[in-house]
Every structure is written in structure tokens, then in C-alpha cells.
């Protein structure tokens, strides 16, 4: 995944350029929008380059024809659009989509992140529908909310919307 790394302080990225590759919150601590202890600062030029270049490599060398971005909402819109542009140069039919949310608060303005509410700004990039998922089985965080598969009412409109593809 591109939204976080296993280590932060002692990661190769942080050892190479301290405090550059990871976002920090207003207290100077590493931000945790990934829910895994850190989040990459995709809006920074060298982080963006690393992500875009690796997608180009995977697509060119291994003929990968689609990419799914875990917690895409941690990434900035510009980086995601640059990924799409780079992918289009290789194969315009390449499929790119991701989860339009984060796992926590990000240390970057929400209006600049690739979250579900901002998908109109993501050109040629889809977002997974957690609304449809939650309507079918219920949200991760609340077992009492509506879910068709559990026989709990309350999400019928979300299901209808999801079934027709949000048209």
C-alpha cells in the first residue's frame, strides 16, 4: 500500500530525509490517517514521484492493468490525478480505483484529499462504495445499524442507490 509504512522513525524513508515523507500533526507528531501509525505525505514532490514512478514500473514491467488504492482518502487529489495521467500514457483502459476514506484524521486539508466527497475531482478514478457495503452487512463500527444480510432494517435507500450504481 502507498498510504503508510510499517515503521516511521526508523523507516528507510525517514532515515534518508527525516520528517519529509510522513505527515505530522500540529503537535509535531506523526499523523495517523492510515490507522497504522503514520501516513505518507503524498502531496510532497518526492513522495508523489515515488508513488507515480512505482505505478508506472508495475504497469510497464509486469503489465498490471489495474490498481486499487487502500485508504485512497489518505492521498491527495493531485497525486491520484497524476497517477491517472501516467497510467493513461501506458494504457488508457487501465482501471484505477480506491477506498474513498481514511482510517483516522489526516494532517492535510480534507478538501484536498481523495475522499469519496471529492471524487468529482478525481478524473478517471473510481471509489469503492462503502455505503453499499454497509447497507448489505452493516458498518464496521456499529452492529445495531441497518444491514440487509443481518435482517436489520434501515438501509433500504442506500441499497437502492448502490444497486443502480449511484446514478
Report residues per predicted region.
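Active-site cores of enzymes that catalyze phosphoryl transfer or operate on phosphate-rich substrates
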Residues: 2
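Active-site neighborhood of glycoside hydrolase catalytic domains
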Residues: 5-112
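Conserved alpha/beta catalytic core and glycan-binding cleft of carbohydrate-active enzymes
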Residues: 63, 84-167
